[in-house]
Amino acid sequence: PEPLSYPTEPPLAVDFESLKAINPDVKGWLYIEALDISYPVVQGPDNDAYLHTTYEGTSNFAGSIFLDYQNRDDFSDGNTIVYGHNMKNLSMFGKLKQMKEQEKYRDSVYFWMLTPESNDVYQIFSAFYTEADSDVYTLYSGGGEAFVQYLNTMAARSEIPVEQPEMDEHSHIIVLSTCAASDTTGRFVVLGVRRNR
């Protein structure tokens, strides 16, 4: 089959100057086409800082969409983990599971990470249920055989039948992660690889 021609027009324009004036922890803006998920992405000093705090700094159970505190904030690591709550009202990552449960990948296999420097489009190559201590959360700064093995392993775990883009040690991926249910250590993850650069 012909390789997918990925979208090149960003879905929205983000005023990062205004966002960073509100909170310098804002690192990007995530937009998931098939799910119409659209939120600023922050990074705190640890992974608890934004669990129940909005990007504007107010206390809120839904919290924020946030980068793993150990990741570089420019998405230059081999894999970058992005967390969000599985909200019953479908806010944050409440709709993420629809990628599998409602076969939303059929609508679009792309999501965007917009940053002050770049508008990057990612192609979803895997989505699956896993556990909080899963090796999907092992961080790789990039390169090396171990990272390639990781990519192959995660692609093979996919529970949705999506086309596999070519990936190698120079690839950059984002892991979108949410809780599978409120009272378990289960997680649901969606993985995408950067296509435009």
PLM region spans:
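Solvent-exposed, non-transmembrane regions of membrane-associated and secreted proteins
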Residues: 1-197
